[in-house]
Amino acid sequence: MTCGNKKRILFVMQSLYDGGAEKLLVDMLNNFDYSKYDIDLLLEHDFGNYANLVPLEVRKIILFYNINRPLLERMIGKIMSYFGLYYFYILFFRRQIIIDKMKGEKYDTIISFLEGRSLVYHSFILKQGIRHLSWVHVDLFNFHWTKRYFKSNKHEKKCYELMDDVIFVSNDAKNKFQQLFNVTTSTKVIYNLIDCKTIVLRANEFKVEKRKFTVCLVGRLVRQKQFDSIIRVARIFVDNGYDIDFWIVGAGCLESDLSKMIHDLHLDDNVHLLGYKPNPYV
């Protein structure tokens, strides 16, 4: 609740390892007016590429300080995930921990800033907030990666309908979401914050030498980003006589698959996986 003249806001996020949503959240936190807001950040773990970029004014609430969960719990999690029962794993192993951590806390607004587990955790602590928002960053109709965290599509829809507003980063994400869920909740589009000043400053930190015309792409190496299509495009350019480099900055679960695809298409000299870079702007 409001403390003095300050509004209390809680952000719920799985982690700050990497990814566009995580970077967006950190940028937002670094642009708050902390004379007007008290901000808490609920995280599973306090680690990741962006964890140290959270401003000191933000109070972190960490669910699990030990990232090495007991062997039995890990085995149960894998088994339940395999059989599509991961929500019940969260319900059994995590729900009470979250409720206990947040006991006595009161907020003007609670925001689950990512789809999936963040929304599930948010649904456990509705009594702690007056207003509830949830962010959707992707096309869930075509890439419904979150369904494993819920009992069913109906359950996931119900969690979204517990919110006062569902926020989307684009009209396309909003339209595809409504194709999937058709929620009655208020929906809004808020485009991603771009911290232009920081981008310009960091772009001048050092100079990168390019040997030829270069196309640089930045993003997580996951199916939704469709970097496999970029590799096929690179093959078309090379086949048509263009001497061109493609740099792909980012890490993710598809790194080995994309690396094999690059090798199989004989593009090792043209397409380069550069991994995660703390400064991708240079």
Q: For the regions a protein language model found, what residue spans apply to each?
A:
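Conserved nucleotide-sugar phosphate-binding/catalytic loop shared by glycosyltransferases and other
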Residues: 6, 13-16, 31, 35, ...
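Nucleotide-activated donor-binding/catalytic signature segment of Leloir-type glycosyltransferases, i.e.
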Residues: 259-277
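A short, histidine- and acid-enriched strand-loop-helix "catalytic/donor-clamping" loop
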Residues: 116-120, 131-149, 165
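Membrane-proximal helix-turn-helix segments that form the acceptor-binding/catalytic region
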Residues: 97-106, 149-167
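An aromatic- and histidine-rich active-site surface loop
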Residues: 91-99, 109-130
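A conserved mid-protein helix/loop that constitutes part of the nucleotide-sugar donor-binding site
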Residues: 22-27, 213, 217-242, 253-260
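Glycosyltransferase donor-sugar binding loop
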Residues: 41-48, 194, 218-222, 245-258, ...
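Carbohydrate-associated surface elements
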Residues: 172, 193
